[in-house]
Amino acid sequence: MFSYLPRYPLRAASARALVRATRPSYRSALLRYQSSEAVGRTQEIVPGAYQIPPRDFSRQHEEKLAPKNAARAPRRIEPATLKLNSKNLSQLQNVTVPTYQREGVKQGIVHVGVGGFHRAHLAAYVDTLLEQFNSQDWSICGVDLQPFAAPMRDALGSQDNLYTMIECDTEGTSARVIGSITDYLFAPDNCEAVIAKMAHPDTHIVSMTVTESGYYMNENTHELQIDHPDIAADLAGQQPPRTVFAYLYAALARRHAAGLRPFTVMSCDNMQKNGDISRNMLLAFARQQNPEVADWIAENGAFPNSMVDRITPRTSDENKAQLAQEFGVEDSWPVVTEVFHQWVLEDKFADGRPPFEKAGVQVVPNVHKVEEYELIKLRLLNASHSAMGYAGYLGGFTYIHEVIADPTFRKYIRNMMQEEVQPLLPRIPGVSVDDYCNTLLGRFSNPTLKDELPRICLGGSGKIPQFIMPSIAEQIQAGGPLRRLTLCAAAWFRYLRGINEQGQAFKLDDPMAEELQAKALESPFSVLEVKSLFGDDLRDDKRFVAELKNALESLERDGARATIAQYA
């Protein structure tokens, strides 16, 4: 269920977790609360349950867990700053650190794409399993495939693969060292080592966060882009491999030849039916290479679908300085995130899995349960992010919390969610979508995250067709309202020109940037001609075309802020 509680098990030594759990702002308004009696000094948060923290804390613990408040005694000692590494771990006084022995833990998970979201999400859940439940077979070997990830290789390598997770909310900040990544491989340095690691019998899951563009799926046909230069190069056997599917196929082919079971391919990307997409793209790639191996994967493999949620901004120099000053930790690349986090995961695995549910993951029996949650999240949270991102950037804002603080933008987002998206969503027993929308507005308003709009705006070619256009298509079919949704698409089309309202150029961060910018500079309306994203149906609908033209004309004539006010 949707929950606003920290989903890690609560312990007396977990700084601020218990305080946050009892704050009214983080109590789930979506669920029927179930009482649960704490056992000893450990209390697990069960999905769908609200639990009262243990009360047998000493005064000392109560003072440590108190929220940041200038009127209270200082909440921590100010130590000398220490470089984060295994040697210094025991000397860090103001952060939660791993107490498990990292050296003897097996790497049952290989994760491709060690970015901020992975480090704040899957790696944090696994860290909880290692810390609280002695899951000794399930640490992570991180993998990056692209040369641009070299700074991550260097940062983790200098810190024994440790990093700090900074959790920010409106009432304070806490920090926790994550130790679940116990090995790291950089494919440009040694692609063979990556394939060998995936093929190793100890590897049971290969998970990935490679973004929408990393799946090479035609958004119109939902088929693998066989003619894409990267896919074509991998199918031709060029070295080093360019795509995740070349690595997955090579490793699975070795396991097939060795008589091993296939590993589970677990997508953690923010896409609807991410498991099904992973399966279809990999099988299409494998059939081009060896139909026998493809059939073996299809029959024996597993590709669980999931819904993932945690806002994770880019790490700034300011975040690093804050970590050093307030917590005494020198970390080359900490990850910054919110307190809220959620993961709904289909229970479909080929070769075993860790007890994810013990760490707060909502493990569900079939894909239909996942689809209900992910549809709500993608159509509300991600669509709203896009609506704020493109129009907000054009309007001169810098951060998401600034956009949502603007009364006209806030009204526009709320009305778009309630009037144009909510009527299209499934009804889930025990879940109030109205309350979920209200909670989203609160999450967007968090000023401590400083979530920059350029992060929200990157990769729009993989976002708008997934988050916005399906709702527009359904409203067209139903004859329902679509003005605000169409304005979101129009703002993206206008954004693709790469020129802001002050006439200043900016760089587009999108895998289709060259093609899309050329269309937008010709005329923003021409972006609709890109069939791989939009097909033909939308261009043929007179009502949508009229709404799109009106929105584009208003953006051009009046600017983003005035247009939002008209549409709110």
Curated annotation (Swiss-Prot):
<dbReference type="GO" id="GO:0046029">
    <property type="term" value="F:mannitol dehydrogenase activity"/>
</dbReference>
<dbReference type="InterPro" id="IPR013328">
    <property type="entry name" value="6PGD_dom2"/>
</dbReference>
<dbReference type="InterPro" id="IPR050988">
    <property type="entry name" value="Mannitol_DH/Oxidoreductase"/>
</dbReference>
<feature type="binding site">
    <location>
        <begin position="109"/>
        <end position="120"/>
    </location>
    <ligand>
        <name>NAD(+)</name>
    </ligand>
</feature>
<dbReference type="InterPro" id="IPR013118">
    <property type="entry name" value="Mannitol_DH_C"/>
</dbReference>
<dbReference type="InterPro" id="IPR000669">
    <property type="entry name" value="Mannitol_DH"/>
</dbReference>
<dbReference type="Pfam" id="PF01232">
    <property type="entry name" value="Mannitol_dh"/>
</dbReference>
<dbReference type="Pfam" id="PF08125">
    <property type="entry name" value="Mannitol_dh_C"/>
</dbReference>
<keyword id="KW-0520">NAD</keyword>
<comment type="similarity">
    <text>Belongs to the mannitol dehydrogenase family.</text>
</comment>
<comment type="function">
    <text>Catalyzes the NAD(H)-dependent interconversion of D-fructose and D-mannitol in the mannitol metabolic pathway.</text>
</comment>
<keyword id="KW-0560">Oxidoreductase</keyword>
<comment type="subunit">
    <text>Monomer.</text>
</comment>
<dbReference type="GO" id="GO:0050086">
    <property type="term" value="F:mannitol 2-dehydrogenase activity"/>
</dbReference>
<protein>
    <recommendedName>
        <fullName>Mannitol 2-dehydrogenase</fullName>
        <ecNumber>1.1.1.67</ecNumber>
    </recommendedName>
</protein>
<dbReference type="InterPro" id="IPR013131">
    <property type="entry name" value="Mannitol_DH_N"/>
</dbReference>
<dbReference type="InterPro" id="IPR008927">
    <property type="entry name" value="6-PGluconate_DH-like_C_sf"/>
</dbReference>
<dbReference type="InterPro" id="IPR036291">
    <property type="entry name" value="NAD(P)-bd_dom_sf"/>
</dbReference>
